[in-house]
Amino acid sequence: MENEKTIDALNELIEINNDRVEGYETASSETKSSDLKSLFSELTRTSQNNLSELRAEVNRLGGKPEEGTRVTGKFFRVWMDVKAALTGDDRGAILNSCEFGEDKALEAYEHVFENHTDQLNNEQLDMIRKQQTALRADHDRVKALRDAE
């Protein structure tokens, strides 16, 4: 399939956004803090919007959007750390874990830019840049809250 590498690159981003949705839904259900619940809901929406765009593009290219998450290691453990931190309701630890997760999401987008730009057209690159900008804004919100603790 001529679009296979493009679909693979887009599916990498789908996986990281699936991770993010799963992680923040877990975090939101576990915390008692209403401001964190609200934040996690907004962060989940960012990834849901990203997923909608990415899945539509994979479908347009004739591929099958990834449904799973990256259970290969680091990112999955981050969310387990978030859950453990939430059990103790330690805002600083929660936000620290969330910032680490945000770093991983940004790294996934950077990886696509560094390794797959020749497989993506201008519209796809623009979509991914826009998503990366939104994720960076989310990262900065989490970091600012963490720094304020």
Where are these regions (language model features)?
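Membrane-interacting alpha-helical segments
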Residues: 1-7, 61-64
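Alpha-helical scaffold segments that form or flank carboxylate-/histidine-based iron centers
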Residues: 5-13, 34-52, 94-98, 123-134
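Acidic/histidine-rich alpha-helical segments that form the ligand environment
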Residues: 9-29, 77-120, 124-127
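A structural signal for well-ordered alpha-helices, especially hydrophobic packing surfaces
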Residues: 21, 51, 55-58, 79, ...
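Conserved alpha-helical segments that form or flank metal/cofactor-binding pockets of metalloenzymes
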Residues: 35-73, 142-145
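Short alpha-helical linear motifs
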Residues: 60-68, 94-99, 119-122, 147-149
